[in-house]
């Protein structure tokens, strides 16, 4: 799939979720969470992939290996969710939890410092992008949310000891 097609599939999950929620008569506040949790944020991974692909084609054009007609147009708005941005504190928190969980999970095994840095980057990115402007969260709220996320992520990502497999037939030496 092209980056544009991949982005469309990912972005469409919001409207698919809203339709499913309405079909099942979920309460309006839950429909709002589904509809608003990505706001108008950028599907950055696929946008970046589209820009890289465009740059590769441009290089091929410069080398005479491709036609200028082959260069795809990359329009940022095509890689943005349709919104609206979160309209309540609860929806703002869900949207932050969604991005923090998916981003930290994709990082694999990380240190506490790396995790904290990534959480801080993600929260800052959402604030700067205006994603939280309409939901009523304060900077004090964001500090509490950040601390809660980090505490939760630490408990999820902490190292665990490797337990031996359980074999009831094995004799235990005394």
Where are these regions (language model features)?
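Membrane-proximal, non-transmembrane interface segments of integral membrane proteins
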Residues: 6-7
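Terminal helices and disordered tails flanking the catalytic cores of nucleotide-processing hydrolases
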Residues: 10-174
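Cytosolic, membrane-proximal regulatory domains of ion/volume homeostasis and mechanosensation machinery
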Residues: 1-3
